[in-house]
Amino acid sequence: MRNITNFLKTFLLWELLKGLKVTGKHFFTRKVTVQYPDEKTPISNRFRGLHALRRYENGEERCIACKLCEVVCPALAITINSTEREDGTRRTSSYEIDLFKCIFCGYCEESCPVDSIVETNILEYHFEERGENIMTKAKLLAIGDKYEAQIAADRLQDKDFR
C-alpha cells in the first residue's frame, strides 16, 4: 500500500501541485507592488533626504561654524572651514558634504544648535559628472532657499518630537 501511495505521489507530481496551490492562493490577492516612477508612496515629514542650509528671515545664514555637525558625522562626510567676521562672530567660508560618504543618519541635523543644517524630503537626485556629489555651501543654501516653506512646515509638524 505504501509503495502505491509513493508511486501516485511521484506520478502525479504531488509536490508540484502543492506549490501551485500556494501560488494560486496568492495570485488573486491585492497587489502590493508600486510602479515607482508613475506611482509614489507618501513620504513622512521625518524622511531624511538631501541636505539643505537654512537662513534667518533677514537673509543671513544660520550656520555659526560651531562644527558640531562635522564632529558628530560618523561617515566623516562634512568638511567646514570658518572665518571670523569683524564683529567677532564666526561664519563658514566653506561647507561641503560628500553625498557618496553620507549615510543620511541625521546626526548633523540633531546636533545643530541653530537649526541650520536640515535634511529635506528630496529623494530623487542624480549626478552626471564627477564632483557633483560634493554639495557646496552655495548648493546647500540654494536648496534651503527653494524649499524653505516645506522645511518650515515639516519642522513645525515635528516640533513635539524634538
Swiss-Prot record:
One of its GO terms (cellular component) is plasma membrane. Coiled coil: none annotated. [4Fe-4S] cluster 2 binds at residues 73, 102, 105, 108. Transmembrane segments: none annotated. It holds the Pfam family Fer4_7. Residues 54-83, 93-122 form the 4Fe-4S ferredoxin-type domain. Its EC number is 7.1.1.-. It is a peripheral membrane protein. It comes from the Bacteria. It is found in: Cell inner membrane. Its cofactor is [4Fe-4S] cluster. One of its GO terms (biological process) is aerobic respiration. It is an enzyme of class 7 (translocase). Its main location: membrane. The keyword Transmembrane does not apply. Binds 2 [4Fe-4S] clusters per subunit. GO terms for molecular function: 4 iron, 4 sulfur cluster binding; iron ion binding; NADH:ubiquinone reductase (non-electrogenic) activity; quinone binding. Belongs to the complex I 23 kDa subunit family. NDH-1 is composed of 14 different subunits. Subunits NuoA, H, J, K, L, M, N constitute the membrane sector of the complex. NDH-1 shuttles electrons from NADH, via FMN and iron-sulfur (Fe-S) centers, to quinones in the respiratory chain. The immediate electron acceptor for the enzyme in this species is believed to be ubiquinone. Couples the redox reaction to proton translocation (for every two electrons transferred, four hydrogen ions are translocated across the cytoplasmic membrane), and thus conserves the redox energy in a proton gradient. This is NADH-quinone oxidoreductase subunit I.
